[in-house]
Amino acid sequence: MSITPRRHVAVGLLCRAAGLGLGIIADHIVPDPQTHHPVAVFGAAVARLEKTMYADSTRRGTLFTVTCLTPLAVIGGAVDRLTRNRPALRIATTALATWAVVGSASLAREGRAMAGHLANGDLVAARKRLPHLCGRDPDALDAAEIARGAVESMAENASDAAVASLWWGAVAGLPGLLVHRGAN
């Protein structure tokens, strides 16, 4: 019995959903690597490429963006294609990619650490922690301003790194997940 196209799509969507869900669970169970995190490695490669390629022009900026994101789309598409008839492998690769790009657990840890410092009135520690969350100069900020900066940054990062990445993963699969995080 062959699988109908409609059933094939349904299985693919179920695998995608399962992979995204398992990736979120893995994000909270499996700690981020201390060195060579996939997002950091990609960011470092983009920074190196930016020094040689980017210029302040629409054409060069477009070329730079396409050069950075096309490999992610190609890799994501190839993995999706190669795992099309292997549901367990598709779930596993989607879960692995989701774990790599969704930073909700590390963001939550940073937020809890900041909340602890502020609750204990430890402004020195809170000021040291703030650059982990945002680019504000913490030395001139009081406790309320540090809290506001932390909350604003956590909300923005939760939207960018977790919610939007998962949305693109749900809508466009592995290529969407990878390209969104790469662009972000």
Where are these regions (language model features)?
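Short amphipathic, positively biased membrane-proximal segments
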Residues: 1-183
